[in-house]
Regions:
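Non-catalytic signal-transmission and effector/linker regions of two-component phosphorelay proteins
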Residues: 1-18, 24, 124-140
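Two-component/phosphorelay signaling modules centered on CheY-like receiver
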Residues: 24-44
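Short amphipathic alpha-helix used as the core "switch/output" element in two-component signaling
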Residues: 76-89
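The feature encodes the CheY-like receiver
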Residues: 71
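Alpha4 helix (beta4-alpha4-beta5 surface) of REC/receiver domains from two-component response regulators
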Residues: 77, 99-117, 121
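Acidic catalytic/metal-coordinating carboxylates
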Residues: 48, 74-77
Length: 140
């Protein structure tokens, strides 16, 4: 039986997404393509590892979307830091990157990444997943 995501939305509580992406153009493209999903709100952004870690420690988000290469630091180190902070609430972790090697996938899984999408071709799959999340669907 697939695990159930602990995110259910209502008109009062949208699914809060935090996006870690260093390219303004890519960040804009992601938001432009996903922002119209009912029940989803982009509640935070960062383009560096240090800034993302600071914001993630200060706020609660339901979904975290990481790029691997960042302006400062990288998404894998950020995931490592988050996993070493057990007081943070559990969030759905997604890597959305053009670095799609199996090594990155394995390391991401070690730090709680549930989904890994290729930035160059899988934006529709990311959208479909987030649509499921906003409906409170069970995800495998």
């Amino acid at each position: 039986m697939p695990p159930t995501l602990p995110v259910a939305t209502t008109a009062v509580q949208p699914v809060r997404v935090f996006l870690v992406e260093d390219s303004p153009a890519v960040r804009e493209l992601i938001v432009e393509n996903l922002d119209d999903i009912p029940g989803l709100v982009f509640a935070g952004f960062s383009d560096t590892e240090a800034d993302a870690l600071r914001l993630l420690r200060q706020n609660v988000y339901d979904v975290l979307i990481f790029d691997i290469e960042l302006r400062q630091g990288n998404g894998i180190s950020l995931l490592r830091s988050l996993s070493a902070t057990p007081t943070l609430p559990d969030s759905l972790k997604i890597i959305f990157s053009n670095n799609v090697s199996s090594a990155y996938r394995r390391v991401g899984e070690q730090y709680g990444v549930r989904y890994f999408f290729d930035k160059t071709s899988e934006l529709p799959k990311l959208r479909h997943l987030l649509e499921q999340v906003t409906r409170g669907a069970a995800l495998s």
